[in-house]
Amino acid sequence: DMNEVGVINEIARGESIYAARFVGKYVYFITYRQTDPLFVADISNPTAPKLLGELEVSGFSEYLHMWDDTHVLGIGYGDSQQSKIKLTMFDVSDPTKPVEVNQKLIDSSESWSNEFVYNYKAILADPEKNLIGFTANDYYLFSYDSENGFSLLEQQALTYKNTEGYRGIYKDNDCLLYTSPSPRRILS
């Protein structure tokens, strides 16, 4: 049995949490319904969590990943119609004032087939190798730097339009797109 030990009231009333990431004494979370804020809360005292900051952004993230000590990567949608995939980088160096420092929108005339919206294992997010990969009709592989933002390294057409089961993995210096029965090299 789980017991509630602390609560933060009166935030994002009527909205749903779409993504959350717990890192040390902080939790970062995204809600969605009318507005799409990123919230930062201090959970160092579990019985008295405190909301520290929030930032309203367009779109919403389905996945959050701590990129480095001061940045959180978000992957989701750039609009409420879910017609654009959005990569976003948040600067959370000041938890009371999170800032969206970069974003990249991917548009498609087709509806999206994205396993990452319900399976976080479908995302390759590796700050050390500077790789961000996921399926969204095709397999996309990006890098990130603070000056240039997100850079598309590779867009690989998928053999099957059902994106389930495709994984970006790396071995040594090769990035592979893996699916049964055999992997394909997409970046060396």
Q: Where are the model-predicted features located?
A:
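Structural motif
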Residues: 35-39, 82-88, 138-142, 188
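Short loop/turn segments immediately following beta-strands, especially the blade-tip
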Residues: 43-46, 90-97, 142-150
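Blade-edge beta-strand/turn elements of extracellular beta-propeller
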Residues: 4-7, 46-54, 96-104, 109, ...
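Conserved blade-ending motifs and adjacent loop-strand segments that build the rim/top face
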Residues: 56-62, 102-120, 152-169
